[in-house]
């Protein structure tokens, strides 16, 4: 029921035409922006696909995966941009390389090779890029970042998506946007939780600045334990 509702709502957001293509999602894919519109994590939580109309699409996503190392490490890739045409394609899946070690993660961050596979099993023709520090400028949300990117002459720019009105809420206030860059260190965190939820909480806590961590701890102490 929930997944069907999510698919229906998103289909209405992106097009008034009939739904013609399914973007398959895996747990490692963190979908951030689609066709210039922010994707809410709570809206997509638990969904294994996203319904889109046929035609040109641009997605911004990250690869986030708990590596089976000792201790466990949560790998997070730089934000990746890919543009593809879904014409005459019923489904599209993002095919990632094997990322099981820190070395795999570093290699993917440095040279993110992946494919978009159509329902016929063949790779689609795509344009891709990495969202880097110089793309950010003074932008504060992912939607404004992508709007600025799309008016530029970059590998995966789509000018048509630069004019889409921003969502009412396109980013969590106080959240920083990790990006790739020459002077940006690769971030990993050693995690010791017993489940993925606990590991994710640890990871995002470590990503926050000291003031945000303090506010979170104050808030957490006030919450009842269920």
From Swiss-Prot:
What keywords are annotated for this sequence in UniProt?
Signal
User: Where along the sequence do coiled-coil regions lie?
Assistant: none
Q: Which InterPro entries match?
A: UPF0319
Q: Which residues form the signal peptide?
A: 1-20
Specify one Pfam family. DUF2057
For this chain, the family text in UniProt reads: Belongs to the UPF0319 family.
NCBIfam families, A to Z: PRK03641.1
Q: What is this protein called?
A: UPF0319 protein YpAngola_A3206
Native organism: Yersinia pestis bv. Antiqua (strain Angola)
């Amino acid at each position: 029921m929930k997944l069907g509702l999510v698919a229906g709502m998103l289909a209405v957001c992106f097009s008034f035409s009939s739904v013609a293509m399914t973007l398959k999602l895996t747990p490692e894919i963190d979908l951030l922006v689609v066709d210039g519109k922010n994707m809410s994590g709570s809206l997509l939580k638990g969904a294994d696909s996203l319904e889109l109309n046929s035609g040109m699409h641009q997605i911004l996503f990250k690869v986030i995966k708990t590596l089976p190392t000792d201790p466990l490490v949560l790998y997070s890739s730089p934000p990746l941009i890919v543009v593809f045409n879904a014409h005459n394609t019923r489904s599209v899946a993002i095919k990632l390389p094997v990322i099981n070690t820190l070395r795999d993660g570093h290699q993917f961050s440095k040279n993110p090779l992946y494919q978009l596979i159509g329902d016929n099993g063949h790779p689609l023709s795509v344009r891709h890029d990495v969202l880097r520090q110089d793309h950010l400028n003074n932008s504060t949300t992912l939607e404004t970042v992508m709007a600025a990117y799309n008016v530029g002459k970059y590998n995966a720019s789509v000018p048509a998506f630069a004019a889409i009105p921003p969502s009412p809420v396109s980013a969590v206030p106080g959240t920083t946007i990790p990006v790739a860059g020459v002077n940006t260190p690769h971030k990993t965190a050693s995690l010791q939780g017993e489940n993925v939820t606990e590991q994710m909480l640890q990871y995002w806590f470590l990503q926050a600045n000291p003031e945000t961590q303090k506010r979170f701890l104050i808030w957490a102490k006030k919450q009842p334990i269920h």
